[in-house]
Swiss-Prot record:
The gene is uvrC. Belongs to the UvrC family. It comes from the Bacteria. This is UvrABC system protein C. GO terms for molecular function: DNA binding; excinuclease ABC activity. It comes from Clostridium beijerinckii (strain ATCC 51743 / NCIMB 8052) (Clostridium acetobutylicum). It holds the Pfam family HHH_2.
Amino acid sequence: MFDFKAQLKILPNEPGVYLMKNSLGEIIYVGKAKILKNRVRQYFQNSKNHSEKVKAMVKNVAEFEYIVTDSEMEALILECNLIKKYSPKYNISLKDDKFYPFIKVTTNEDFPRVFITRNYAKDGNKYFGPYPNAGDVHETINLIRKIFPLRTCKKSIIEGEKPTRACLNYHIKKCNAPCEGRISKTEYKKMIDEIMEVLSGKDRSLLNKLKEEMQSASGNLEFEKAASLRDKMIAIENIAEKQKVFKSQENDEDFINIYKDEKDCCIQVFFLRDGKITGREHFMIENSSHEEDTTIISQFIISFYGGTPKVPKNIYIPESDEIEALEEFLSIKRGSRVFVKVPIKGEKKEMLELVKNNAKVTLDQFKDKILRDKEINMISLKEIQELLELDSIPLRIEAYDISNIQGVDSVGSMIVFENGKAKNSDYRRFRIKTVKSANDYDSMREILDRRFTHGLKEIEEIQNKEIKFSSGKFSNFPDLIMMDGGKGQVNIALEVLEKLGIDIPVCGLVKDDYHATRGIIYNNNELIINRNSNLMQMIRRIQDEVHRFAITYHRSLRDKRTLHSILDDIPNIGQKRRMSLLMKFGSIDNIKKATLDELLETESIDTKAANSVLEYFRNTK
């Protein structure tokens, strides 16, 4: 038994993070404190000033732990990391956490690649960005690839090593084929240097050079070359124009503000570069009204700027009691001093008010849409409750489907709709194990039996406290099961449930001659549904989703089988050689056409293995 009185007495007078746990040992809240002793004790003393959510949380606390940190900044960072890791019930969830895209140049490779990434790492490569507008960065990459014939493959290409066959990009003049040794490392580097000059905003010297080349070509009557150089200059100017917006300057400023209603909040960020608003972002945080603005903003700043080294010099916020800790964290990220400021009056204060007003508008729009969607979804769920005469509204619906081609790679899928919305985290896939032929009924019997048997086992383990409720993947049973098939599949489901002693209503979908759903089969009766009703719209969403999920899984299994099964049958070709052949030739058809010499050029393929490949395809023609 946890001794609260004793543990509260020994809390340290130091900064740190505390973790509240329920009777199942689950972490339900994570918080930080400048002084752990003072902060944690507040929860278990006078509760008059506590919000309803805090009161509810404290009622569920069975024990607590704490971690002492060296500084307030460390506590701030650790709190955010633990919230992300455990997603505690009573913490706000920054679900819209996002990292902006960078352009990465892999300068640590002999023949560097240039591509978009959202993962910044100190790996010796060159990064440009971040770009708040993803559309702009994609346009920039497209322009770069249009004027510079760069490689886009992930091959490890080292100058002087054995060349490999070039891909299609070389033949359509989009790559200079360093893999075949058609361009030297030095020549390729010149191209990369030009790209990095443009991305760094140092485009003027390159444009002057291209202008001279264009005039020379024109003077020599090489009009096609001159036109090509002109197009290249225009593209570079377009890229350079975009880069000006994202180039980090000493006067870069971000303005962050928050607007809350009785339940949710919206954080809005305005990006100012050279005194102009160059972009903005919003982040919706549901069920967060109980948290103080300062707490939400601090957690947001740690999360938002945690994934990028490109932190502005000045960040303006409405209020904070953790400015020193935030400045320390942000300065480390930037590599130079960052100032977090709370303006009292003047232009900066007015800008923060503008940001807050925009946050309010965004939240209102968001709530309007959410309310409309919730209202429509609830109408649909009430319609199906009335249609099937259910005791309660089916807030959780599970739908099942089988996918196969002539009995091969049979797979089952389970999708979940909660409150009329898809809940992707609860989707499950089943690879059929016991059914060898194309038998949808037996396949459906197998996946339903596996799903609910596993669910019953988890429920027992939860009751015995062997696992936590949140760890159960199948323990949450539906209020309604929806079979994509008709009466036959419904009967299979009822048979499985009866065998397991589970009472859940099951309905099936009735199709017309064009395979479009026209109604529901329930208790052996066909119930027609108005094709324009909210209920029919929801059923179609469920049906489309279960089809998509099943077919996607089936396709991935089929592609793996098609790609590897033929090579699996060739003597002397193991996994390593199989991968080498596929890496070199790209497809089974190309391997079939390969000569002995071409096969011997492949890594790890000796004469014996090459002859085995030739012999196999000769005998299977």
